[in-house]
A protein has these predicted regions:
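Intrinsically disordered, compositionally biased charged tails
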Residues: 1-6, 222-270
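Ribosome large-subunit tunnel/peptidyl-transferase-proximal elements
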Residues: 1-185, 191-201, 206-209, 213-228, ...
Length: 270
């Protein structure tokens, strides 16, 4: 899926945080300031999504795997749905330390989960006492909670997508240590230098997270199908970009439509 400027505007991807909370390293991604809020230059967002999509598709064609990470409440269900849709892996609960840097040990815990699932399917648990069954279920539920999205993973992922650099900094730190490529949404209060491909965007709005995560999941699917991503700018997109760049009054009017709702979501996070 090719993401357009119009789509990004509609989901509120252009809303940053309050200007007083910004990270100066994000300056190059900011278009303007309105009502004390930084507004993203969505040209950079589109460029980053396209770059990430091409890279993901290329690696998937080569047989590499990817993990989607989103442990904050707005992203949890999205990363699960999109990872499952494209047949990749995900973490949407707490990041377990060593997941990448001590991968062989983590694999043992995933293997244990698989064995417990097989035991249930074979009916082995029918022989358990009440206490044994209770302990079995407790262990299985815990493993499923933290490792259910990693079932079947056999090697360290080449690409790690993170929905929030601050919330999931541990995932980023481990990914960099094992030389995985990190793609992440970066809001105006984030440090873009901690990831390989920063995607400047509102990282609190559910619809923005969904749109961008879906685009990356589509890239996985295209890579599996052996397709080369070719991006052509449509006439509609060119008009939207021209509007965004040249007519600030129209932008401001558009922004007002979803401004209050988007700011409420950000204030909850802050």
């Amino acid at each position: 899926m090719q993401v357009t400027m119009k789509q990004l505007l509609e989901v509120g991807a252009h809303f940053g945080h309050q200007t007083k909370r910004w990270n100066p390293k994000m300056k190059k991604f900011i278009f303007m300031e309105r009502n004390g809020i930084h507004i993203f230059d969505l040209r950079h967002t589109i460029d980053a999504i396209e770059k990430a999509s091409r890279m993901i598709a290329d690696f998937v064609r080569q047989g590499e795997v990817m993990i989607f990470v989103g442990t904050k409440k707005q992203a949890q269900e999205i990363v699960k749905e999109e990872a499952e849709r494209c047949g990749m892996y995900y973490v949407n609960e707490r990041w377990v330390g060593g997941l990448l840097t001590n991968f062989s040990e983590i694999r043992k815990r995933i293997d244990r989960l698989e064995e417990m699932i097989r035991m249930e399917e074979r009916g082995d648990t029918s022989k358990f006492t009440y206490k044994e069954l209770k302990e079995f279920k407790k262990e299985k539920d815990k493993l499923m909670k933290f490792f259910g999205g990693l079932r079947g993973i056999q090697k360290i992922p080449k690409v790690v997508f993170v929905a929030d650099t601050k919330k999931d900094i541990n995932a980023i730190t481990e990914a960099r240590k094992v030389k995985s490529i990190v793609i992440s949404l970066v809001d105006t209060n984030c440090d873009p230098d901690v990831v390989d491909i920063p995607i400047p965007s509102n990282d609190d709005a559910i619809r923005a997270i969904k749109l961008i995560t879906s685009a990356l999941a589509d890239a996985v699917i295209e890579g599996k199908e052996g397709k080369v991503i070719e991006l052509e700018k449509k006439e509609e997109e060119e008009k939207a970009e021209e509007l965004f760049l040249t007519n600030e009054e129209e932008i401001e009017e558009f922004m007002k439509e979803g401004f209050d709702k988007e700011m409420e979501e950000k204030e909850e996070e802050e």
